[in-house]
Amino acid sequence: MGRTSRTVAGAAILAVLCASGTVVTAHAAPAGPDIVIPGIEVPEIGDLVPPAQSELFGGGRNLFPDRRFVALYGHPSGPALGAFGEQDTAGAITRVRDLAAQYQQYSAEPVLPAFEIIATVASADPGTDGRFSRVTPPEQLRPIIDEAEAAGIYVVLDLQPGHTHFLEQARIYEEFLARPNVGLALDPEWRLAPGQQHMVQIGSVDSSEINEVVAYLADLVQRHDLPQKMLVLHQFRSSMITTRELVDAGRPEVSVVLHADGHGSPAQKMDTWGALQQGLPPQIHMAWKNFYDEDVPTFTPEQTMTVEPKPVFVSFQ
């Protein structure tokens, strides 16, 4: 009997039984022992709930406009490369938390502490690879980033690549960039063209190279279901980023921040601040740097936060 014939016959028998008043009762089979199939693990109900998405410190998955950052900049080797290295990681955590608290009264949004750590350091000598850039091994940075993460400190890894492409160096630190609260900074001052040397020429980068990094970070965010990733671009003169108007700032996975690195008198800093905003794509946020030694004087929190537009990221060097 075909499948259709059996279905029709079954329906007819059921109709006859119902019409005759016969009660049809479904009997459950007696309970027996659980059947275990080797190699197959049946998940508990709770295991079927998808894991919660990772969030940024302070909550949420988009960086701005719901928060600002205050950061210590430098390298763990010591104070010569910035304020971060003036103390150990625990001391830096205490210090940057205090700095962030000083800025909070001047911001309606939460001000979160951060580190900007130089991961690759511009070098006066070419090194064995001829690239004028010293790569800090990931294993040296791992305990620092772990400690910062445990303390709720956002970390930005800064690249000073010499003759190396930014993307090549960024990939070295992918294990950290795959974390939800680690961002990236590109420092074009130290991106050399063939034949150039640090402190002889000021480096530069084209938007096409920056966009390779944007695409890489966006893909990383998608693959690991991460919150939005911060990409900081350092600049203090227009020639440092060529075709800047073509920087891809429209990817929702990446928030691009232009870090104005001008130093000197208040008038000089404000001139740099204004000049760098000319022709800036509207999706790019502005960041500010305070120098302890080169600024005369160093801006106070109140002075810094009266700058327009109000910076989303303030670093100390």
Which residues does each PLM region occupy?
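Substrate-binding cleft of extracellular glycoside hydrolase catalytic domains
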Residues: 102, 110-190
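Secretory targeting and sorting signals
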Residues: 2-28
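N-terminal module-boundary/linker segments of secreted carbohydrate-active enzymes
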Residues: 29-90
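Surface-exposed substrate-engagement region within the catalytic domains
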Residues: 200-316
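Hydrophobic faces of well-ordered beta-strands that scaffold small-molecule active sites
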Residues: 68-74, 113-117, 155-159, 180-187, ...
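N-terminal-biased segments
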Residues: 65-124
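Short amphipathic alpha-helices and their capping/turn segments at secondary-structure boundaries
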Residues: 53-62, 93-109, 169-179
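Active-site-proximal loop/turn and secondary-structure-junction residues that shape catalytic pockets
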Residues: 76-78, 119-121, 161-163, 188-192, ...
